[in-house]
From Swiss-Prot:
PROSITE patterns named among the record's database cross-references: LON_N, LON_PROTEOLYTIC, LON_SER
Compositionally biased spans, kind Basic and acidic residues: 80-101, 142-152, 815-831, 846-856
Keyword Ubl conjugation attached: no
Gene symbol of the encoding locus: pim1
Identification of the protein by name: Lon protease homolog, mitochondrial
Single GO molecular function: single-stranded DNA binding
Oligomeric form and interacting partners: Homohexamer or homoheptamer. Organized in a ring with a central cavity.
Reactions catalysed, as given in the entry: Hydrolysis of proteins in presence of ATP
Length: 1107
């Protein structure tokens, strides 16, 4: 190693070639990093610049035109005298370092000349590889001391062969290989400052070592185990600052040129005792060379460069030799918190260039390169550049360099690339490089296949587009006008682009659109295909309405539209709460079951408004055609999709609320069973891919909320009923109907009658009378009709009382209406003047025109008009009462019992009457006759009741042989109404026992429950409706099965008010409730008339008549 004092002897003045070297350097000094991963290249002269750059630059340092060495470190060989001087001074310097610095392991290098203010300096101990020619890439002109003035030879500074201590920079992702540039980014400001000072001092040498962790990102080596111990000795050819993407701070980008392999022997991390113990005064003791300014030649390429620090030749005049201690080149780095390392050079193991294995591996690498180059143009450029840099022209002569090149251009794993760098055995290195290159070959094959597939698709589309453009041009030249088909095709394309069609649907759409483009508009198939595409593009694929999961808003909306219906409202609120927690909701299938007029259909619309969904309703009552649900086949003329697809088209969303009304009245015919078609539609597990016969593509209905309505569940097929969540809506009681009438029905009817703001009062007692005497059903539909009738009658009376003068017909018409009336009268007068008899068709058209609505002015009612409708004058508006009372008997005779029934109209009181058809004699025979339009179940109930009543009499009243001789007739009034259901058992039994015991029943007791032969009372349904009917009939007690106790407890208090509920388990309990004061001795006496006694009475009567 040469000390600074010896520099003038080695670097002689080369003034004769100063201008030529300076001119050459100016064209190559501006170095720019290549924005790509991996190895990076710098700007080259135009004649040596490749046509394309790859992600891994293969630019090696270029020597002179006639240079025969590969990666040669000099432009011109040194003289024998200079070479001997170098060796002598190196030996002297080594001895001085060993004696004076026993603790320090780092050696000193040549002192650099001072850097000028613009960041450019001539290198004394080394040169910049990026700014000149040759492997070192730069040239420097030392001082003229020690060289004769007449010596004009120019010697290029040599890269130090021994540089024991350098600053270490960790590298991420992939290692550096000797001879191949790489750009790195320094984010640590301390490291960036150290690099800047190194460049200014002319010591731009660092050690680059690969991180073991791929995700590591640091500019300082904290621990020796964090990096691999084999790296490269690299020269910083240029460096320039860059702003970060976030605009905060700045980083330094440096271009490194690796020269040789080195091994890390010792790490001196920042802040270590060894680094702190070194006296910083050594740096200050170093003599500062004074630069001799030289005129600089600036060309266009240099002006465009953005290099902050580069290396050019410059003349340096050193100061006189000082008497201080020898200069240490890296001592100035001790003040920076950077990592320093002691390194040793690694040399390749000797090998036989003629080895058959090496030659075979070399040939294989060359063959793989050829194959990769044929598939990847970037590799082709890299190989071309590598070949140009090899002046020998024979890759066999440099197998080690070929292995490094193979690893440098391959995108292998960091560990695999590090193994190539760490291998000093050439044969082993080539094997590992071949493995990495083979993997790159596989990647290139896959990339080539993908590229070909993409190109084929693009080429096909481009060809189709080119042909279509040609066809349009031919039509335009021939003057053939477009038939509108092209516009239609473009319209369908635009509509489809706005939709998120599934892949299967998109394929069908493309096929049909292609078919449409090739069909003639006059063809019948053209209209079929056009209609199909129109439906396909009107389905809201991927479009959903924003749902409202606000609980308070839902409560407000539901309460505004409906009174009561607590169960339904709670279920909807549960649905909204689940959607709020999950962020989304799936489609559900709800079925509202209840009597007519309770709000089943209208509640569906309120639910849609509360959820913010679109609403669609269709009825399936009496539906017999499956095509109404699943659509028609396209082969039929006038084919249409099913009602569900029509609902999606109308609502324009995938998540509407669809109300299927009257699902219990669906029919069945020769065209199929619609209820079976609904199985797929209303199954959450299947409707995600609902297949309509017309569309013939799967449609997702899983987001649709289906709501069905029915009066009864008996007629709904069981598989279909199982798919729905049934919510029962019971009938309204009198109090609820009163509230509904006051809050909803009366204001609506008043507004519809044109009496809004007019003092027309419908009193509370009038509404009660309507409920009691006119509208006894469980719903409010008839009540609504009666209230509307009341307000219509009121409007008629008001208009009649005010008279025609309040608003004459001439003043009622607006200007528009008057013009229409004048036109009509003019036409009539013209027809009359012509005397032509108008035809029936003309008369019809004239009448139609006359009946056309004409704009009119609304009549204003004076404020003094007051109308009051109360209980007394109610019949003047709605007529006489329809019902007098539910109670047929104020006092029931023996054999008459009040039962309770549950029908589609709600609950009703049902009497059971039993009479004795003839006198009880010893000769009479027992019999039972049943009337009242009873169906099978009630007939069986009557038979069971008759048998059980006979058993009770035989057991408890054996002497009363009533059923042995009695001819009994049992009747249920209102025979025009069919009656069926298992809930009249105890009522019939009680009626028969009342007749047998000749004891009347309390008329304020009603009962319901089915009976077994052993006397067990079974559970029934519709207890709420039946309780409402009992209350309406004025009952005070309701007897019901004990199994229905939970239903009784759920009844609102206003329903149970004034009624005592008595649950029973056995009929014996019913008997004790019905006959609490029965005289058992009297009841146990026989009521049969003996035959001899009757004969004596008859003969005596006959004799009396004869006398």
């Amino acid at each position: 190693m040469l000390s600074r004092q010896r520099i003038p002897r080695i670097l002689a003045s080369r003034t004769s070639l100063a201008h030529s070297i300076r001119s050459f350097t100016s064209t190559t000094s501006s170095i720019r990093p290549v924005a790509a991963a991996g190895q990076h290249a710098v700007t080259r002269p135009r004649h040596e610049r490749p046509t394309n750059l790859s992600s891994f630059s293969t630019y090696t340092a270029l020597g002179k035109k006639n240079d025969k060495g590969f990666f040669d470190n000099s432009i011109e060989p040194l003289s024998e005298e200079e070479r001997k001087a170098n060796v002598e001074h190196a030996e002297a310097e080594a001895k001085e370092a060993e004696s004076k610095q026993a603790k320090s392991k780092s050696s000193t290098s040549d002192a650099p000349p001072p850097a000028p203010e613009d960041g450019k300096a001539g290198a004394a101990g080394g040169s910049s590889a990026g700014s000149g020619s040759g492997a070192d890439g730069g040239s420097g002109d030392g001082g003229k001391r020690g060289r004769k003035p007449g010596d004009k030879a120019l010697a290029k500074p040599v890269v130090p062969e021994i540089y024991p201590q350098v600053m270490a920079i960790p590298i991420a992702k992939r290692p550096l290989f000797p001879g191949f540039y790489k750009a790195i980014t320094i984010k640590d400001p301390n490291v960036a400052a150290a690099i800047t000072e190194m460049i200014k001092r002319g010591q731009p040498y660092v050690g680059a070592f690969l991180f073991k962790d791929e995700n590591a990102d640091d500019d300082v080596i904290r621990n020796r185990d964090d990096v691999y111990d084999v790296g490269v000795f690299a020269q910083i050819t240029s460096a320039f600052p860059m702003n970060n993407q976030n605009g905060e701070g700045a980083s330094l980008t440096a271009i490194l040129y690796p020269h040789r392999r080195i091994k890390l022997s010792e790490l001196i991390p920042p802040g270590s005792p060894e680094a702190a113990s070194i006296d910083g005064a050594k740096e200050g003791a170093a003599p500062e060379p004074v630069p001799e300014p030289i005129p600089k030649v600036t060309d266009e390429s240099e002006q465009k460069g953005d290099v902050v620090a580069s290396f050019e030749e410059s003349a340096v005049t050193p100061r006189p030799e000082p008497s201080q201690k020898p200069y240490e080149p890296t001592s100035f780095l001790k003040k920076y918190p950077v990592s320093l390392v002691n390194v040793e050079n690694l040399t390749e193991e000797p090998y036989d260039p003629k080895s058959q294995v090496i030659r075979a591996v070399t040939n294989e690498i060359v063959n793989v390169f050829k194959e990769v180059a044929s598939m990847n143009s970037l590799f082709r450029d890299q190989i071309s550049t590598f070949s140009m840099s090899q002046s020998t022209g024979n890759v066999m002569a440099e197998p080690a360099k070929l292995a490094d090149f193979a690893a440098a251009v391959s995108a292998g794993e960091p560990a695999e690339l590090q193994e190539v760098l760490s291998s000093l055995n050439v044969e082993e290195r080539m094997h590992k490089a071949l493995l990495v290159l083979k993997k790159e070959h596989v990647n290139a094959q896959l990339q080539s296949k993908i590229t070909k597939d993409v190109e084929q698709k693009i080429t096909k589309r481009q060809r189709e587009y080119w042909l279509m453009e040609q066809m349009k041009g031919i039509r335009r030249e021939l003057g053939i006008e477009s038939d509108g088909k092209d516009k239609l095709v473009e319209k369908f394309k635009e509509l489809a682009d706005k939709l998120a069609m599934p892949e299967a649907v998109r394929k069908v759409f493309d096929d049909e659109l292609n078919k449409l483009a090739h069909l003639e508009p006059a063809a019948s198939e053209f209209n079929v295909t056009r209609n199909y595409l129109d439906w396909l593009t009107n389905i809201p694929w991927g479009q959903s309405s924003a749902e409202n999961f606000d609980i308070l808003n839902a409560v407000k909306v539901l309460d505004e539209d409906h009174y009561g219906l607590k169960d339904v409202k709670d279920r909807i609120l549960e649905f909204i709460a689940v959607g709020k927690l999950r962020g989304t909701v799936e489609g559900k299938i709800l079925c509202f079951v209840g009597p007519p007029g309770v709000g089943k259909t209208s509640i569906g619309k309120s639910i849609a408004r509360a959820l913010g969904r679109q609403y669609y309703r269709f009825s399936v009552g009496g539906l017999t055609d499956v095509a109404e649900i699943k659509g028609h086949r396209r082969t039929y003329v006038g084919a249409l999709p099913g009602r569900v697809i029509q609902a999606l088209k109308k609502c324009k969303t995938e998540n509407p609320l669809i109300l299927i009304d009257e699902i219990d009245k669906i029919g069945r015919g020769y065209q199929g069973d619609p209820s079976s078609a609904l199985l797929e539609l209303l199954d959450p597990e299947q409707n995600g891919s609902f297949l309509d016969h017309y569309l013939d593509v799967p449609v997702d209905l899983s987001k649709v909320l289906f709501v069905c309505t029915a009066n009864l569940t008996d007629t709904i097929p069981r598989p279909l009923l199982d798919r729905m969540e049934v919510i029962r809506l019971s009938g309204y009681v009198a109090d609820e109907k009163m509230a509904i009438a006051e809050k909803y029905l009366a204001p609506q009817a008043q507004e519809m009658a044109g009496l809004k703001g007019v003092d027309v009062q419908l009193t509370k007692d009038a509404i009660e009378e309507l409920n009691k005497s006119y509208c006894r059903e469980s719903g409010v539909r008839n009540l609504k009709k009666k209230i509307e009738q009341v307000y219509r009658k009121s409007a008629l009376k008001i208009v009649q009382d005010l008279g025609e003068q309040a608003l004459p017909e001439s003043e009622a018409l607006t200007e528009e209406g008057k013009a229409a009336q004048e036109e009509t009268e003019k036409k009539k007068s013209e027809e009359a003047a012509s005397g032509e008899t108008s035809s029936p068709k003309a008369a019809t058209e004239a009448s139609e025109k006359e009946t056309t609505e004409k704009p009119r002015v609304a009549m204003k009612i004076p404020e003094g008009v007051h109308v009051v409708i109360n209980k007394d004058n109610l019949k003047d508006y709605v007529g006489p009462p329809i019902f007098t009372s539910d109670r047929l008997y104020d006092v029931t005779p023996p054999g008459v019992t009040m039962g309770l029934a549950w029908t589609s109209m709600g609950g009703a009181a049902m009497y059971v009457e039993s009479i004795l058809q003839s006198a009880l004699t010893s000769k009479s025979a027992p019999s039972l006759e049943i009337t009242g339009n009873l169906k099978t179940v009630m007939k069986e109930s009557s038979a069971i009741a008759y048998s059980y009543a006979k058993a009770v009499m035989a057991k408890d009243f054996p002497k009363n042989r009533f059923f042995d001789k009695a001819k009994i007739h049992v009747h249920v009034p209102e025979g025009a109404v069919q009656k069926d259901g298992p809930s009249a058992g105890i009522t019939m039994t009680t009626s028969l026992l009342s007749l047998a015991l000749d004891t009347p029943i309390d008329p304020q007791i009603a009962m319901t429950g089915e009976l077994t032969l052993t006397g067990k009372v079974l559970r029934i349904g519709g207890l709420r409706e039946k309780t409402v009917a009992a209350r309406r009939a004025g009952c005070k007690m309701v007897v019901f099965p004990e199994d229905n106790m939970s239903d009784w407890l759920e009844l609102p208090e206003n329903v149970k008010e004034g009624i005592e509920g008595r649950p029973v388990r056995w009929y014996s309990e019913v008997f004790d409730l019905i006959f609490p004061k029965l005289d058992r001795e009297k009841a146990n006496k026989s009521r049969i008339i003996e035959d001899d006694k009757s004969e004596k009475e008859e003969s005596k009567k006959k004799n009396d008549d004869d006398e």
